[in-house]
């Protein structure tokens, strides 16, 4: 069983609530040059369609800051400006109407001395600040204290020190992240942080790597923390299309039952017993059901060993063998079809089942905006 959500203060990032009273949100970051407004808005639209709740954009140059007002206004989801090095861009982002600002206190010039101004501006605008501490860019004072190592204790101390400066100026609409590229150190840092404050926590493994490796690192780290009730918003960092970050993040939450499960395709990993090309069959079924946004479990099994049992546990499934496929609905065999008709039959039955679902269930599924994804089981 999962531990109860850790109680936190509540923030509003635009229209999205962040904190223990709200569902855990999934974020991503654009990979476009922010000053290329059309490209940035196009990517934000793609992220929104994939289920992204909040999007972050980089702001390294004056031309990027100049683009923020249009992007913040036209984006269908809340925009967070990601600020490093130059504190002036914090004020540009606030003036532009961004829903929140992420600051990295480890690399912004003389940040401590600007906290009062930032707190005043953010408070007047009514937007939150995320203090984003990163193992690769810790404040030199903290690094010196911890002998040059970005330990969990160093990450936590840096974050809470900066938060205390904001609190001294009467500003408390703060979220915190303490990211590290090592998921073990990252998990420990968040555990320590969770015990010492009530700020909402943004989870992330920084520099997680390419799609496969990054997915593994983030899944391990997020699973460990979320199962303990720690985490209020997540970003899966991948060296891949940002849409993939949303798919992974959403699936992590669904796997932990922290989001309603949507269309799930269960397929066996295949072995020498398989009497059908399971990989091809699963891919074709997934492609055919893409866009069917309902809580439906479809099993695609390659033989009669695991097939009937797995298919019976699903809403709809097939157990293949001898050039045929037995189609199951809620554990009952409804028909046997030639192998060439399996995909089309499953698609037709899935559509039929979807039409009979409770309208409220369908409405909730449609509101989630998520599409089919393959889940491979063993």
Swiss-Prot record:
<dbReference type="GO" id="GO:0019288">
    <property type="term" value="P:isopentenyl diphosphate biosynthetic process, methylerythritol 4-phosphate pathway"/>
</dbReference>
<keyword id="KW-0408">Iron</keyword>
<dbReference type="GO" id="GO:0051539">
    <property type="term" value="F:4 iron, 4 sulfur cluster binding"/>
</dbReference>
<dbReference type="InterPro" id="IPR045854">
    <property type="entry name" value="NO2/SO3_Rdtase_4Fe4S_sf"/>
</dbReference>
<keyword id="KW-0414">Isoprene biosynthesis</keyword>
<dbReference type="GO" id="GO:0141197">
    <property type="term" value="F:4-hydroxy-3-methylbut-2-enyl-diphosphate synthase activity (flavodoxin)"/>
</dbReference>
<keyword id="KW-0411">Iron-sulfur</keyword>
<comment type="function">
    <text>Converts 2C-methyl-D-erythritol 2,4-cyclodiphosphate (ME-2,4cPP) into 1-hydroxy-2-methyl-2-(E)-butenyl 4-diphosphate.</text>
</comment>
<comment type="pathway">
    <text>Isoprenoid biosynthesis; isopentenyl diphosphate biosynthesis via DXP pathway; isopentenyl diphosphate from 1-deoxy-D-xylulose 5-phosphate: step 5/6.</text>
</comment>
<protein>
    <recommendedName>
        <fullName>4-hydroxy-3-methylbut-2-en-1-yl diphosphate synthase (flavodoxin)</fullName>
        <ecNumber>1.17.7.3</ecNumber>
    </recommendedName>
</protein>
<dbReference type="Pfam" id="PF04551">
    <property type="entry name" value="GcpE"/>
</dbReference>
<dbReference type="GO" id="GO:0005506">
    <property type="term" value="F:iron ion binding"/>
</dbReference>
<comment type="similarity">
    <text>Belongs to the IspG family.</text>
</comment>
<feature type="binding site">
    <location>
        <position position="310"/>
    </location>
    <ligand>
        <name>[4Fe-4S] cluster</name>
    </ligand>
</feature>
<feature type="binding site">
    <location>
        <position position="303"/>
    </location>
    <ligand>
        <name>[4Fe-4S] cluster</name>
    </ligand>
</feature>
<dbReference type="GO" id="GO:0046429">
    <property type="term" value="F:4-hydroxy-3-methylbut-2-en-1-yl diphosphate synthase activity (ferredoxin)"/>
</dbReference>
<feature type="binding site">
    <location>
        <position position="271"/>
    </location>
    <ligand>
        <name>[4Fe-4S] cluster</name>
    </ligand>
</feature>
<dbReference type="GO" id="GO:0016114">
    <property type="term" value="P:terpenoid biosynthetic process"/>
</dbReference>
<keyword id="KW-0479">Metal-binding</keyword>
<feature type="binding site">
    <location>
        <position position="268"/>
    </location>
    <ligand>
        <name>[4Fe-4S] cluster</name>
    </ligand>
</feature>
<dbReference type="InterPro" id="IPR011005">
    <property type="entry name" value="Dihydropteroate_synth-like_sf"/>
</dbReference>
<keyword id="KW-0004">4Fe-4S</keyword>
<dbReference type="InterPro" id="IPR016425">
    <property type="entry name" value="IspG_bac"/>
</dbReference>
<keyword id="KW-0560">Oxidoreductase</keyword>
<dbReference type="InterPro" id="IPR004588">
    <property type="entry name" value="IspG_bac-typ"/>
</dbReference>
């Amino acid at each position: 069983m999962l531990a109860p959500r850790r109680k936190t203060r509540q923030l509003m990032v635009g229209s999205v609530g962040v904190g223990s009273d709200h569902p855990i949100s999934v974020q991503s970051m654009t990979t476009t040059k922010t000053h290329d407004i059309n490209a940035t808005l196009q990517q934000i639209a793609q992220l929104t369609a994939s289920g992204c709740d909040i999007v972050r954009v980089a702001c390294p140059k004056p031309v990027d800051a100049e683009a923020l007002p249009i992007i913040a206004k036209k984006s269908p989801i809340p925009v967070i400006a990601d600020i490093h090095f130059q504190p002036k861009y914090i004020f540009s982002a606030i003036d532009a109407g961004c829903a929140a600002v992420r600051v990295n206190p480890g690399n912004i010039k003389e940040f401590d001395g600007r906290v009062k101004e930032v707190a005043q501006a953010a408070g007047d605008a009514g937007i939150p600040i995320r203090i984003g501490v990163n193992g690769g860019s810790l404040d030199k004072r903290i690094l010196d204290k911890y002998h040059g190592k970005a330990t969990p204790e160093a990450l936590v101390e840096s974050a809470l020190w900066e938060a205390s400066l904001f609190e001294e100026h009467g500003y408390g609409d703060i979220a915190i992240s303490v990211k590290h590229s090592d998921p073990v150190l990252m998990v420990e840092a968040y555990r320590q942080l969770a015990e010492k404050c009530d700020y909402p926590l943004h989870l992330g493994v920084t520099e997680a790597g390419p799609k496969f490796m990054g997915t593994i690192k983030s899944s391990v780290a997020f699973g460990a923390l979320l199962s303990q009730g720690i985490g209020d918003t997540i970003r899966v960092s991948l060296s891949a299309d940002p849409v993939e970050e949303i798919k992974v993040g959403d699936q992590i939450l669904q796997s932990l039952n922290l989001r309603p499960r949507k269309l799930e395709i269960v397929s066996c990993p295949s072995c020498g017993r398989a009497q059908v090309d399971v990989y091809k069959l699963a891919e074709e079924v997934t492609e055919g059901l893409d866009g069917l946004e309902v809580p439906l479990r479809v099993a695609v099994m390659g033989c009669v060993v695991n097939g009937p049992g797995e298919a019976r546990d699903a809403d709809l499934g097939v157990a293949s063998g001898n050039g045929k496929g037995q189609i199951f609905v809620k554990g009952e065999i409804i028909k046997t079809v030639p192998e060439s008709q399996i995909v089309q039959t499953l698609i037709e039955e899935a559509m039929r089942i979807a039409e009979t679902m409770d309208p409220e269930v369908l409405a909730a599924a449609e509101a989630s905006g998520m599409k089919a994804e393959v889940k491979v089981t063993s």
